[in-house]
């Protein structure tokens, strides 16, 4: 019985160690910006396989540590077995909840940006000043074109200049908004990866210390 439990503990610790290693390696790549979005099917396949392997090791470690705890006699049911068994569920639960939180934050960011841009009133005098400046610039440019061509200045030319200026400003705003969303999303991925790696590594280290302490 003792030999069987020892072998089972070895399997559980090895599974948890491999899981912690995969998570930590992935975290280092993410933090160092070595993982970039790609449409390459080979890279997607590798990521999918690593995720499946990590999930499998997580499940194996959780189940086996649980079996070891409940199969051991009362005096051998050490707390580290429970902590190690809860490492996998803790990382999974954290990833699930944190992902939902960050997705909600990103969604609120997008909606807030759009609402502020389309519906919030501008500061007093700002809208009139900007419109006046745009009109003067467009009028001056149109006047120069009209003078070169010997024609008369048309109001439609001025209006077109203002519309182009506003369209360019809206385009710049959309780009800034998209860049901010990407920055927030990248930050959330890094934070979640680091936290998951820390939880998995701490669970693995305490399980190794716990097993070593049994033989002292």
Curated annotation (Swiss-Prot):
GO terms for cellular component: mitochondrial outer membrane. It is found in: Mitochondrion membrane. InterPro entries: ATG33. Disulfide bonds: none annotated. It is a multi-pass membrane protein. The lineage of its organism: Eukaryota, Fungi, Dikarya, Ascomycota, Saccharomycotina. Belongs to the ATG33 family. This is Autophagy-related protein 33. It comes from Candida glabrata (strain ATCC 2001 / BCRC 20586 / JCM 3761 / NBRC 0622 / NRRL Y-65 / CBS 138) (Yeast).
């Amino acid at each position: 019985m003792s030999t069987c439990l020892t072998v089972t503990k070895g399997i559980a610790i090895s599974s948890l160690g491999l899981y912690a290693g995969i998570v930590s390696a992935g975290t280092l790549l993410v933090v160092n910006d070595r993982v970039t979005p790609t449409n390459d099917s080979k890279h997607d396949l590798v990521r999918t396989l690593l995720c499946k392997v990590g999930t499998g090791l997580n499940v194996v470690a959780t189940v086996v540590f649980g079996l070891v705890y409940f199969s051991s006699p009362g005096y051998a049911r050490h707390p580290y077995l429970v902590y190690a068994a809860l490492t996998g569920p803790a990382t999974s639960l954290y990833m699930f909840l944190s992902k939902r939180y960050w997705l909600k934050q990103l969604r609120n960011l997008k909606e807030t940006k759009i609402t502020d841009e389309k519906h919030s009133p501008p500061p007093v005098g700002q809208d009139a000043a900007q419109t006046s400046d745009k009109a003067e610039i467009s009028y001056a440019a149109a006047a120069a074109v009209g003078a070169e061509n010997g024609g008369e200045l048309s109001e439609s030319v001025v209006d077109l200049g203002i519309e182009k200026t506003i369209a360019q400003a809206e385009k710049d705003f959309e780009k800034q908004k998209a860049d901010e969303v990407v920055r927030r999303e990248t930050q959330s991925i890094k934070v979640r990866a680091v936290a998951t790696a820390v939880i998995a590594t701490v669970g693995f280290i305490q399980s190794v210390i716990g097993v070593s302490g049994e033989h002292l």
